[in-house]
Amino acid sequence: MVFPDQFKNHILPDQIHILNVCFVSPELRREYGGCAGNIAYNLKLLGGNPLPMGTVGKDFQEYRQRLRTLDIPDHLVRELPELYTAQCTITTDQDNNQITAFHP
């Protein structure tokens, strides 16, 4: 996500002990990533035959379809139906400062 301002205009140093902020991001995009996925994708682009291994959650179906579209096998990916896949949300301001939230 891109924040069309600077975080420093909204995070007040003298009030950092009571930090409560909300940044409106006018656009959102989903990127397919993760270590195994990124390596598999790039190996495939280079003509290789990757075999990604990893653990994913109940929200993997869309990513699985992408892997299959790219002819990347997913039989070594373990799906845990009671959990969500780890994910990261990064918001970047106009100065390229970032605020990251990560769910393992």
Describe these PLM feature segments.
Residues 34-38, 55-58, 89, 97:
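Gly/Ser/Thr-rich helix-start
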Residues 53-58, 75-85:
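Beta-strand->loop->alpha-helix junctions that form or flank phosphate-binding loops
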Residues 39-40, 60, 94, 102:
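Residues at secondary-structure transition points
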Residues 1-53, 62:
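Glycine-rich phosphate/adenosyl-contacting loop at the front of the ribokinase-like
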Residues 75-80, 88-104:
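Conserved phosphate-binding/catalytic loop of the ribokinase/pfkB sugar-kinase fold
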Residues 58-71, 75, 88-92:
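Active-site-proximal loop->helix
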Residues 45-48, 72, 94:
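Generic secondary-structure signature for well-ordered alpha-helical cores
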Residues 2, 59-62, 85-87, 99:
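Short active-site-adjacent helix-start/loop capping segments
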